[in-house]
């Protein structure tokens, strides 16, 4: 069946449910896991009223710290379950980063949440989940 699962997480509560589901599935299948969190590239200007310049170094440092925290949590959960887990932080548009990581790591299933940090603003699926489902050649398990 599946031998190598990619579990995508942004650290949100719903993504945490996808992590738990993916790890339990990996354990049941005897599969290994690659956990990925994707950070969008820095944007110099934050649009909107009262726009301000956000220093790239500060953004990159905060993104790296957040990714390390999120991925360390996944690795700790995997270790408790006895599941082999590699962690990866990618700077890319989220859907593209997930798809590319699955391909690069040879994953045969992507596990991800239906919605991420941007909230449940869409009725069925968030925009990143839709993009992954639309463009991935690897099967995708969406968790709600």
Each language-model region and where it sits:
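Gly/Ser-rich helix-loop-strand patches that form or flank binding pockets
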Residues: 24, 100-144
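Conserved functional loop/turn residues at catalytic and ligand-binding sites
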Residues: 1, 37, 82, 93, ...
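Short, well-ordered secondary-structure micro-motifs
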Residues: 18, 45-48, 98-100, 122-124
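Structural beta-alpha unit
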Residues: 76-110
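Histidine-centered beta-alpha loop that forms part of the nucleotide-sugar donor binding/catalytic region
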Residues: 10, 92, 114-117
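A short acidic, glycine-rich active-site loop
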Residues: 54-69
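Small/aliphatic-rich secondary-structure junction motif
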Residues: 3-54, 77, 81-86
């Amino acid at each position: 069946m599946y031998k190598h699962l990619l579990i995508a997480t942004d650290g949100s509560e719903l993504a945490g449910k996808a992590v738990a589901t993916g790890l339990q599935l990996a354990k049941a299948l005897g599969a290994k896991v690659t956990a990925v969190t994707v950070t969008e590239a820095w944007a110099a200007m934050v649009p909107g009223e009262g726009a301000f310049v956000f220093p790239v170094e500060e953004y990159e440092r905060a993104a790296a710290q957040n990714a390390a925290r999120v991925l360390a949590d996944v690795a700790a959960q995997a270790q408790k379950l006895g599941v082999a887990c590699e962690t990866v932080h990618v700077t890319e548009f989220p859907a593209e980063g997930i798809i590319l990581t699955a391909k690069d790591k040879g994953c045969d299933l992507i596990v991800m949440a239906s919605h991420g940090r941007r909230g449940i603003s869409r009725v069925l699926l968030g925009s990143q989940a839709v993009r992954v489902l639309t463009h991935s050649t690897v099967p995708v398990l969406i968790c709600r």
